[in-house]
């Protein structure tokens, strides 16, 4: 859900392109340059890719990714570092259709927990023990004055 909100609210949405092993590096560098031109800080950037895009990146001779990532970062989903951005691989089923890649700064979007409520029922009828019921409501927002910190590249179908 959060990636969908970020894709819709992105400040940079160039025309869809067919990503190949020959052009993937140039497209990512274009994204980085666009964020640089809008004075987005170079620290705390994240490059979100699908497994298919990650495969193209691995096949590209121009990309040399720093893959010596600590265990703590791997637990968070970071698989590499490219041009100073943490590279995060996300399953295509969790991303919008035709998702190529997204380069974003952490200050451009927030994903708050709006509601978190739990109830415990001690020994309810039919159950021996404690029954816990709960609900959690999440949301996501792209800040209007920070939307230039998101570059979303769609791929051609």
Language-model region placement:
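Long, contiguous amphipathic alpha-helices that act as assembly "spine/axial" helices in icosahedral shell
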Residues: 1-13, 36-51, 117, 121-142
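Hydrophobic, aromatic-enriched interface-forming segments
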Residues: 19-62
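Sequence/fold signature of self-assembling virion shell proteins
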Residues: 59-157
């Amino acid at each position: 859900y959060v990636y969908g909100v970020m894709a819709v609210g992105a400040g940079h949405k160039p025309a869809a392109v067919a990503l190949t092993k020959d052009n993937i590096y140039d497209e990512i560098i274009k994204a980085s340059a666009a964020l640089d031109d809008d004075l987005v800080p170079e620290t705390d950037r994240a490059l979100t890719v699908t497994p298919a895009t990650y495969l193209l990146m691995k096949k590209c001779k121009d990309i040399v990714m720093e893959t010596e990532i600590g265990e703590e970062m791997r637990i968070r989903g970071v698989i590499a570092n490219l041009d100073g951005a943490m590279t995060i691989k996300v399953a295509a089923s969790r991303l919008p259709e035709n998702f190529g890649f997204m380069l974003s700064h952490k200050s451009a979007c927030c994903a708050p927990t709006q509601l978190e409520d739990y109830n415990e029922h001690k020994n309810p009828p039919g159950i021996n023990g404690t029954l816990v019921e709960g609900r959690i409501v999440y949301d996501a927002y792209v800040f209007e004055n920070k939307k230039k910190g998101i570059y979303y590249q769609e791929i051609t179908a």
